[in-house]
Amino acid sequence: MAYPFQLGLQDATSPIMEELMNFHDHTLMIVFLISTLVLYIISLMLTTKLTHTSTMDAQEVETVWTILPAVILIMIALPSLRILYMMDEINNPVLTVKTMGHQWYWSYEYTDYEDLCFDSYMIPTNDLKPGELRLLEVDNRVVLPMELPIRMLISSEDVLHSWAVPSLGLKTDAIPGRLNQATVTSNRPGLFYGQCSEICGSNHSFMPIVLEMVPLKHFENWSTSMI
């Protein structure tokens, strides 16, 4: 869950988000080292009067500043490609949930059940109970089993939307006429909040997403009560 003046990412709840946080730290370290080197060179240029007016050809220097950036880019690209592959890979999901974006709410359908579907609207500020979060609470939460792979099929019925839950490392576009998919796996139970992350009209800010991850037994009891 995000909080005011937060500097870092939200706590990771899924294996994908853990990998994304590691990749973020890996890339940030490389950027920091490059920035330090550039600032050091600039400071030397500003503080020294020494110049190399006779240097017309420096084959070694050109070789270094050609090979070194290529190596750095490879160091960034390889872990990035690995994470992209992990995000697209779905192995034997135990559950499939179809998510449809509308102006301005979400609808969910549990395709493994016969009549388990509902719409999810934001709770207006005046109707919030003590402790509930403004612009983030919904009337119907998406209840899912934890520690199991779940496939989300995401689309839209009108305009472009984006289904995003930062704690799980999820952000998938909802495009009319196209079906995108994402894998949801939570390492722990709890409530995880997200919002539509694609500007979709005047009420774009009022399309929250709430996932309630519970043990499998609790999910079975919930699904039975909903049918």
UniProtKB/Swiss-Prot annotation:
The gene is MT-CO2. Cu cation A2 binds at C196, E198, C200, H204. GO terms for cellular component: mitochondrial inner membrane; respiratory chain complex IV. Gene3D superfamilies: 1.10.287.90, Cupredoxins - blue copper proteins. This is Cytochrome c oxidase subunit 2. Its cofactor is Cu cation. It is a multi-pass membrane protein. SUPFAM superfamilies: Cupredoxins, Cytochrome c oxidase subunit II-like, transmembrane region. Component of the cytochrome c oxidase (complex IV, CIV), a multisubunit enzyme composed of 14 subunits. The complex is composed of a catalytic core of 3 subunits MT-CO1, MT-CO2 and MT-CO3, encoded in the mitochondrial DNA, and 11 supernumerary subunits COX4I, COX5A, COX5B, COX6A, COX6B, COX6C, COX7A, COX7B, COX7C, COX8 and NDUFA4, which are encoded in the nuclear genome. Cu cation A1 binds at H161, C196, C200, M207. It comes from Apodemus semotus (Taiwan field mouse). Mg(2+) binds at E198. It is found in: Mitochondrion inner membrane. CDD domains: CcO_II_C (cd13912). One of its GO terms (molecular function) is copper ion binding. Disulfide bonds: none annotated. Coiled coil: none annotated. Residues 1-14, 88-227 are mitochondrial intermembrane. NCBIfam families: CoxB. Pfam families: COX2, COX2_TM. Residues 46-59 are mitochondrial matrix. It catalyses: 4 Fe(II)-[cytochrome c] + O2 + 8 H(+)(in) = 4 Fe(III)-[cytochrome c] + 2 H2O + 4 H(+)(out). It comes from the Eukaryota. Keywords: Copper, Electron transport, Magnesium, Membrane, Metal-binding, Mitochondrion, Mitochondrion inner membrane, Respiratory chain, Translocase, Transmembrane, Transmembrane helix, Transport. The chain crosses the membrane at residues 15-45, 60-87. Its EC number is 7.1.1.9. Belongs to the cytochrome c oxidase subunit 2 family. One of its GO terms (biological process) is ATP synthesis coupled electron transport.
